[in-house]
Amino acid sequence: MVDGGGGASDLLVIFGITGDLARKMTFRALYRLERHQLLDCPILGVASDDMSVGQLVKWARESIGRTEKIDDAVFDRLAGRLSYLHGDVTDSQLYDSLAELIGSACRPLYYLEMPPALFAPIVENLANVRLLERARVAVEKPFGHDLASALELNARLRAVLGEDQILRVDHFLGKQPVVELEYLRFANQALAELWDRNSISEIHITMAEDFGVEDRGKFYDAVGALRDVVQNHLLQVLALVTMEPPVGSSADDLNDKKAEVFRAMAPLDPDRCVRGQYLGYTEVAGVASDSATETYVALRTEIDNWRWAGVPIFVRAGKELPAKVTEVRLFLRRVPALAFLPNRRPAEPNQIVLRIDPDPGMRLQISAHTDDSWRDIHLDSSFAVDLGEPIRPYERLLYAGLVGDHQLFAREDSIEQTWRIVQPLLDNPGEIHRYDRGSWGPEAAQSLLRGHRGWQSPWLPRGTDA
């Protein structure tokens, strides 16, 4: 096993290049990297579909054209990088052919856009033909389906790869506001001074989707909301919101601080979790008629460390809700009643809102007094307006993988810790509550916040209805 440290990749090998992820995300990201002149290596696609390179190029153009206005010169440069290998990834002969095609490439990036059950077999086959020396391997979530399977997967990968050769892809870590979180927190004294238990009374994280499982019924029914978005996306976001400042600029410096947050979190309590399922879910193709899989989950947790002790954290995620929005909302502590006002009713607590998606931005909600009453005043910033066009998550992650930047990828210990945190909810899932499509989930979710701020209407982009 050879160190897979720094240095840019000189070949990108995409396993599953004819799959759904490539069609929706990967080709678009590659095109945008090519447009920005950030792509500098050949691309070899591997899949079971029997097609020519010309057919792959045509399929890539159709995939990109769904969302991008294509510049022919840019696409022609991208097309010139493409080659294709047809075969079964479980067949050892495929890897002999792959070794011949790779030739003199010395630092390939293998991007595994494949079902998780194939991650370890593919990597082990690559090791058998000595194709892992100085290579990096990117694997898409989910990383296991519980703590035991995550431990097993990590053990099999680590048997043939160093930790610095493994890139665990979670596209949420490539979203602009998530990337910017540590800079927002620690580069701005006005925020840094407020960011602890002395000023923050509670934290809410919402990930709402206004659509159902669509054509992913069979996949989703074996996963559910907790595995699909909470164990990975939302706990990673929570760590970035609550971690201490990294002591240096390396990926390990950042991941060390995230891991500290996870270690300070107790396993989730099933009595502080509400699971829901939207009406009509069991009629979706691929979903069991008696399914108890959750399409909505709300939970309460805490971080038992000096900065956050005693601050409740509420997380909710669901499908078929009124809007598509992901946000983090921090409530500041209420100020005392103001004796110099005729009406001594205290102002509503200030709020800091970070909208991750759509139209990323930050809002500071403050109070103003007019006509003997309090009014909320919103100070809003749109990152697209103030910082320019954002880099798309997969574009950012692909580039980071190609140049060997590990900052945007999850580390082994964090994956295992987040599975440890959610494991009690997998072992004791509890009752499933039905809810109407277009609602904010089951009524039972309100009970989690008894004695605290209720679930807030999310901050939506201007002109968006919910």
Swiss-Prot record:
The active site is at H233. It is an enzyme of class 1 (oxidoreductase). SUPFAM superfamilies: Glyceraldehyde-3-phosphate dehydrogenase-like, C-terminal domain, NAD(P)-binding Rossmann-fold domains. Keywords: Carbohydrate metabolism, Glucose metabolism, NADP, Oxidoreductase. Pfam families: G6PD_C (PF02781), G6PD_N (PF00479). Transmembrane segments: none annotated. GO terms for molecular function: glucose-6-phosphate dehydrogenase activity; NADP binding. One of its GO terms (cellular component) is plasma membrane. Its EC number is 1.1.1.49. NADP(+) binds at S48, D88, V89, K141. Substrate binds at H171, K175, E209, D228, K319, K324. It catalyses: D-glucose 6-phosphate + NADP(+) = 6-phospho-D-glucono-1,5-lactone + NADPH + H(+). One of its GO terms (biological process) is pentose-phosphate shunt, oxidative branch. InterPro entries: G6P_DH, G6P_DH_AS, G6P_DH_C, G6P_DH_NAD-bd, NAD(P)-bd_dom_sf. Pathway: Carbohydrate degradation; pentose phosphate pathway; D-ribulose 5-phosphate from D-glucose 6-phosphate (oxidative stage): step 1/3. NCBIfam families: PRK12853.1-3 (NF009492), zwf (TIGR00871). Belongs to the glucose-6-phosphate dehydrogenase family. Catalyzes the oxidation of glucose 6-phosphate to 6-phosphogluconolactone. This is Glucose-6-phosphate 1-dehydrogenase 1. It comes from Mycobacterium tuberculosis (strain ATCC 25618 / H37Rv). The gene is zwf1.
